């Protein structure tokens, strides 16, 4: 397989499939695809009393924004909730979407929801 063929295959994948691919690559090669800590670490280091980086986060939907329908769709995808439950969660913002989530997954969830138009906080 050529590099171009691999790139074309990746272009055709959904965000969920890409996330699974990254995790599989991390496990297979013993590496981490985490972004450099310099950017995110500066904000996190200020709040850390003992200097340790937080490993588990609560993903909180702060507000749905103008594209509420898109946010509901993303919340359904991320949580596996039904339409009624996802709508109730989004309508009741601020609400916790998931608790005790690994940093990479929390950041991925935040990016997906913000891309859909919502505002998210990681606590």
Curated annotation (Swiss-Prot):
GO biological process: translation
Keywords assigned by UniProt, alphabetized: Ribonucleoprotein, Ribosomal protein
Family of this protein: Belongs to the bacterial ribosomal protein bL12 family.
Pfam families reported in the protein's UniProt record: Ribosomal_L12, Ribosomal_L12_N
Keyword Ribosomal protein among record annotations: yes
GO molecular-function terms, A-Z: mRNA binding; structural constituent of ribosome
Domain of life per record: Bacteria
Annotated GO CC locations: cytosolic large ribosomal subunit
Protein function: Forms part of the ribosomal stalk which helps the ribosome interact with GTP-bound translation factors. Is thus essential for accurate translation.
Protein name (record): Large ribosomal subunit protein bL12
Complexes and interactors: Homodimer. Part of the ribosomal stalk of the 50S ribosomal subunit. Forms a multimeric L10(L12)X complex, where L10 forms an elongated spine to which 2 to 4 L12 dimers bind in a sequential fashion. Binds GTP-bound translation factors.
